Amino acid sequence: MKQIVITLLLTFAVVTLKGQVLQSVPERVLNHQMDMKAPLPEPLFKMDTTIVRVHILNWKPSMCVFNIVNLNIQDLSSFLALNYTGQINNDGLAFIRIPLRGVADASIGIDNDFSSYFLLNPGDTTDVYVDLPRMREVCRAYMEKQSERVDYGFGNNDIPTAEQTKRYMISNEYGLDTQPFLWFEGGCADLNTVCHRYMPFLKYNPWNMDLENRLMVNKHLKDRYVDDMLKRRDYLKKQIKKDKRLPLCAKQYISLSVDLQAERCLRSFIQHHYRGDVNSIDSSSKENAMLKQRYISILRSLGTNTNYRAYLKHSDYSDFSSKFFSGVFSDNELCDYLHDITLLYDYSSRINNDEKLSGDEMEQLRMPFYRNILQQQIDAQQIVESEEYNGDLLEDLRNRYKGKVVLIDFWNTACHGCIMMMNYMEPLKDTVFKHPDAAFVYITDHVSPVDRWLEFRERIRGEHIRLNDKQKAELDKQFSIRTLPTYILKDRQGNFRNINGNLNDFKIELDKQ
């Protein structure tokens, strides 16, 4: 399988449990009564193992190409999505054990179809019941709609009509309130159930951001955009507050998502019109100084400077975010989460580029949770440094695997397709590709964070090699590597060739006498 590199990371976990195929959702789940008064708890900043049991209703192996559940995760330590997988057993159950770092967003993927997001907490056990045909129906309807180009009838320099600027609430358009495809038990079940049934598919809140992005850059709306956007925010919050379907925890969660989207709208508006953050606004004139102070006051009044925003992580970690928030809040005013996540983003990048951190820099992190994460990355980097590869790779492989047939997998931890194929291949090493002459080599570079790379090295059998950028670039050129994963085959005579993802060539070469 060839796939352009995308920003997903993947890890694998499989446990087989005996039982029977579920024909329907258990009655105890269907009859569960939500606690309508329970508030949204503070987000968890801790590391613990989370267990997710995915039950496919009316399961048959013929329902999937790969009988694997992909669980896409973004926790409080990762700047890209992680992906854990579980094999679906004969009973339609996939058991996935996750070393979770803080509260996480999750979605289920089966083949090329995926679910809406739900929440996982470290230490919880969550059961997810899936109506796979219904999930595919909704997912494909969603993807078809995303491919449609919406024409709002006005450009950046046009004067839009009142009708064109009319905002409307995005609702769940796929009938999930009466025909859901996910049911939850354990963990954040109430909140997950509400978001799945009543929130827009794969969105955090009811903003129409396609229209919003068009409005904020229109030059004729510049003077009124912020006021109109804030009116919209207030309207949405009122609608949420009076929605009797929602328990208190969901009202607080969705209301926070609206506030965060208002914050991001204002940030994007300032960035577009003033080419940067609030500090970019020229305050030399009295009018501009007042305007700058007004924007700062609005941002402070949104109430988003809180650790609760960890529930709805988007782009809180970036150089721009760090500069933006420093222009609105003093360092002492920033909530612990915002303070530490921007530092972690910077520190992690430096560690991955072989830079050293001082003890003073480590002490700047307020939360033990993030100090522990950073220390794990430092420890992993030290292991990698002691094993840095500096040889002639192809010649070394010829000598080390003389007379062997070697499958060389070029991959990285940001490639979803790479990891899916690694997971698929692992059990085949004991069946289809079981041969005394078979060998497996996995090659990556600095794109793969060291701590994640070490996790894969422990789990995926074979030799794992980490190259520097120059070495990787030379091999990319030699073998015309443009997509990942790419498979290079070394035959018994020591010749190397790109097999263009055709793993059958590896099997044919093994079977040669």
Language-model features: locations:
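A non-transmembrane, solvent-exposed segment enriched in polar/low-complexity residues
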Residues: 21-248
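Conserved redox-active cysteine motifs that mediate thiol-disulfide chemistry
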Residues: 402, 410-427
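Bacterial Sec-dependent N-terminal signal peptides
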Residues: 1-24, 513
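Alpha/beta-hydrolase fold active-site loops
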Residues: 405-406, 485
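Thiol-based oxidoreductase modules, predominantly thioredoxin-like and allied folds used
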Residues: 435-452, 459-471
